Amino acid sequence: MANLGCWMLVLFVATWSDLGLCKKRPKPGGWNTGGSRYPGQGSPGGNRYPPQGGGWGQPHGGGWGQPHGGGWGQPHGGGWGQPHGGGWGQPHGGGWGQGGGTHNQWNKPSKPKTNMKHMAGAAAAGAVVGGLGGYMLGSAMSRPLIHFGNDYEDRYYRENMYRYPSQVYYRPVDQYSNQNNFVHDCVNVTIKQHTVTTTTKGENFTETDVKMMERVVEQMCITQYEKESQAYYQRGSSMVLFSSPPVILLISFLIFLIVG
């Protein structure tokens, strides 16, 4: 790992050195190094706007074709199409779309921003279910094809599998000492929640249903455990990689080149 980090450091130093030097070189010339300027910023010999208030053909400061300070086509200071100082579409001083100005629009409270970090964490680990003490609801799964040892139960399962859970409730794998504890807890909570929810809708389960649900949910909880264990291992490996000294040194050097 240390050798890999050192080689990566050498490669990026060679790649970014020229870029860092080029960013610090002064560039010749620039915009507005001479020529016309706005009033009050003039330089000797530079062009300036005329000091008198009138525009072309206006004796008293008006716009084009306006004798008394109005905008285009307005005799008394109004905006375009407004005779008395109003904004666009307002005859008496209102802002755009409002008769009393636009300042009230800027006093509205801003909408709260969504915390993207929390959203990303919920999407990666599953949605936390309120009222279940930290349990999360896994993504939907296809119900496994299970054989129960006799034709009657196999046929009953195929005909009623849609009534059984397609998602399981679970806690993070790091809260359990082994897979069996995770699966046992996952099965109990999932069946209890599904039974209570379904019973409130007026549907009851027989002993055969409960027996089949236990087998189905057990397989789904095992699948969920394998998925969560793999994700937990990958997160741990990433933390080890980015905490190694060569990688930290490399990242610090890149930040220095970009910012400096």
Swiss-Prot record:
Lipidation (GPI-anchor amidated serine): S237
Ranges for the Sequence repeats: 51-58, 59-66, 67-74, 75-82, 83-90, 91-98
Prodomain residues: 238-260
Binding annotation for Cu(2+) 3: H84, G85, G86
Ranges of biased composition (kind: Gly residues): 52-102
Topology term for the membrane: Lipid-anchor; GPI-anchor
Tree of life domain: Eukaryota
Chain sites annotated for binding Cu(2+) 4: H92, G93, G94
Covalent S-S links between cysteines: C186-C221
Region (Disordered): 26-112
Binding positions for Cu(2+) 1 per the UniProt entry: H68, G69, G70
Membrane spanning residue stretches: none
Signal peptide start-end: 1-22
Glycan-linked positions: N188, N204
One Gene Ontology biological process: protein homooligomerization
Residues annotated for Cu(2+) 2 binding in this entry: H76, G77, G78
Entries under PROSITE patterns matching the protein: PRION_1, PRION_2
GO cellular component labels: Golgi apparatus; plasma membrane; side of membrane
Matching InterPro entries: Prion (IPR000817), Prion/Doppel_b-ribbon_dom_sf (IPR036924), Prion/Doppel_prot_b-ribbon_dom (IPR022416), Prion_copper_b_octapeptide (IPR020949), Prion_N (IPR025860)
SUPFAM superfamilies named among the record's database cross-references: Prion-like
Illness association: Found in high quantity in the brain of humans and animals infected with degenerative neurological diseases such as kuru, Creutzfeldt-Jakob disease (CJD), Gerstmann-Straussler syndrome (GSS), scrapie, bovine spongiform encephalopathy (BSE), transmissible mink encephalopathy (TME), etc.
Subunit record text: Monomer and homodimer. Has a tendency to aggregate into amyloid fibrils containing a cross-beta spine, formed by a steric zipper of superposed beta-strands. Soluble oligomers may represent an intermediate stage on the path to fibril formation. Copper binding may promote oligomerization. Interacts with GRB2, APP, ERI3/PRNPIP and SYN1. Mislocalized cytosolically exposed PrP interacts with MGRN1; this interaction alters MGRN1 subcellular location and causes lysosomal enlargement. Interacts with KIAA1191.
Role summary: Its primary physiological function is unclear. Has cytoprotective activity against internal or environmental stresses. May play a role in neuronal development and synaptic plasticity. May be required for neuronal myelin sheath maintenance. May play a role in iron uptake and iron homeostasis. Soluble oligomers are toxic to cultured neuroblastoma cells and induce apoptosis (in vitro). Association with GPC1 (via its heparan sulfate chains) targets PRNP to lipid rafts. Also provides Cu(2+) or Zn(2+) for the ascorbate-mediated GPC1 deaminase degradation of its heparan sulfate side chains.
Similarity comment text for this entry: Belongs to the prion family.
Protein name: Major prion protein
Source organism (scientific name): Saimiri sciureus (Common squirrel monkey)
Gene: PRNP
